[in-house]
UniProtKB/Swiss-Prot annotation:
Alphabetical keyword list: Ribonucleoprotein, Ribosomal protein, RNA-binding, rRNA-binding
Gene: rpsR
Subunit structure, interactors included: Part of the 30S ribosomal subunit. Forms a tight heterodimer with protein bS6.
Biological process per Gene Ontology, one example term: translation
Name the UniProt record assigns to this protein: Small ribosomal subunit protein bS18
Family per record: Belongs to the bacterial ribosomal protein bS18 family.
């Protein structure tokens, strides 16, 4: 029996490229909140559509912002 042909999912567009953002800064909490889930976890690359290098920079910026108390470590909702 033949296997059904699986279609590849459509690649997500890079939100940083479409917004023309080159530098990711830990002080830009409005931008960083787009990459954090409602539970306070950093969203995966496959969800956000950013490149490997940008994902690393986002993760570092989020961790720095959390350390500086600009972003919460977890969600406030319980």
């Amino acid at each position: 029996m033949a296997k059904p042909v699986l279609r590849k999912p459509k690649k997500k567009s890079n939100p940083l490229k479409s917004a023309k953002i080159e530098a990711i800064d830990y002080k830009d909490t409005v931008l960083l909140r787009k990459f954090i889930s409602d539970r306070g976890k950093i969203r995966a690359r496959r969800v956000t559509g950013v490149s490997v290098q940008e994902q690393r920079a986002i993760a570092k910026a989020v961790k720095n912002a959390r350390e500086m108390a600009l972003l919460p470590y977890s969600s406030s909702a319980r």
